[in-house]
Amino acid sequence: MIEINRVNKVFYQGERAINALSDINLTIEQGTIFGVIGSSGAGKSTLIRCVNLLERPTSGHIIVDGVDLTQLSNKELSLARRKIGMIFQHFNLLSSRTVFENVALPLELAGASNNAIKEKVDGLLKLVGLSDKNDTYPCNLSGGQKQRVAIARALASDPKVLLCDEATSALDPATTQSILDLLREINRELNLTILLITHEMDVVKGICSQVAIIGDGELVEKGPVGDIFAHPKTELARKFIRSTLDLSIPTDFQARMTPEKVTGSYPLIRLEFTGASVNAPLISQVAREFNIDISILSSDMDYIGGVKFGLMLAELFGTEQAAEQAIAFLRDHKVNVEVLGYVA
């Protein structure tokens, strides 16, 4: 449905070239909810703006529904964009227009009749749960309601693709979840392809079936969400996964922690369990086999894309040799172990 083929985007500040995107290749199938995640400045918003050519790639091709947008004339591109809806972080509603009038705007610009506009807008407002807000102005809506209006407006032209640029970043957690639920419902009912840009792994976890991770303008990893969570190949992927299960080192431990082992100190480790290692009784096995005591400071587990994953902070009490053997045993059983320091 969407092919992003060897896309590069270069911005210039005077004579200085800034590579915002470098050789990006992605294929997004029809009906997929596809997430692109990255930190601020990673290039993800530039990428989504390239998909409908709000930003024209410096090189490469954007193919949507079999049509290479980079080869179209301005008139042809304008027509093609009608099949690509887009919503933004800050809604971009017209304050002087009511909810009904905001949603009707694309239809008015396309020359639809008044009867056709009313029928279409009424149906869209019902779909997004705002049938009772026809005559309300944006200033009297909550953030979540404004985003629902923006979604309805984006769907007015019956697009095949919906682009979401940080669509939940300005919303509180409960409202974010309601918008994600709405997007999932729209995807299911309309078989709509959704490309979603975010810096929040929780959003990807909550709605996406496929994900790509971008860092410094480059594609770092891509694949099914469950596979990325279960088998992250890069530190950037692990960083985003950890952000969904935030296990902070207690303050008193930080004060007593040293980077190197000293007399009377014991290793503080972070364990990342994915796939089969989540269900295996590895902690009890380690304690028995290596005669070591394990003090679990905190742990958390989640389930996504058919895969369990979890994090744990633990302190190992025993001889130095036993601790090293225990860590080696865990790593042999596909547990990622990081020694954070030593606590006296």
From Swiss-Prot:
GO molecular function, one term: ATP binding
Alphabetical UniProt keywords: Amino-acid transport, ATP-binding, Cell inner membrane, Cell membrane, Membrane, Nucleotide-binding, Translocase, Transport
GO cellular component: Gram-negative-bacterium-type cell wall; plasma membrane
EC number(s) stated in the UniProt entry for this protein: 7.4.2.11
SMART domains: AAA, NIL
Binding-site residues for ATP, renumbered to this chain: G38, S39, S40, G41, A42, G43, K44, S45
Pfam families associated with the record: ABC_tran, NIL
Catalyzed chemical reaction(s): L-methionine(out) + ATP + H2O = L-methionine(in) + ADP + phosphate + H(+); D-methionine(out) + ATP + H2O = D-methionine(in) + ADP + phosphate + H(+)
Matches recorded under InterPro entries: AAA+_ATPase, ABC_MetN_proteobac, ABC_transporter-like_ATP-bd, ABC_transporter-like_CS, ACT-like_dom_sf, MetN_ABC, MetN_ABC_transporter-like, NIL_domain
Sections of the chain in a coiled coil: none
Predominant subcellular localization, coarse grouping: membrane
Function: Part of the ABC transporter complex MetNIQ involved in methionine import. Responsible for energy coupling to the transport system.
Subunit structure: The complex is composed of two ATP-binding proteins (MetN), two transmembrane proteins (MetI) and a solute-binding protein (MetQ).
PANTHER family found in the cross-reference section: AMINO ACID IMPORT ATP-BINDING PROTEIN, METHIONINE IMPORT ATP-BINDING PROTEIN METN
Protein name: Methionine import ATP-binding protein MetN
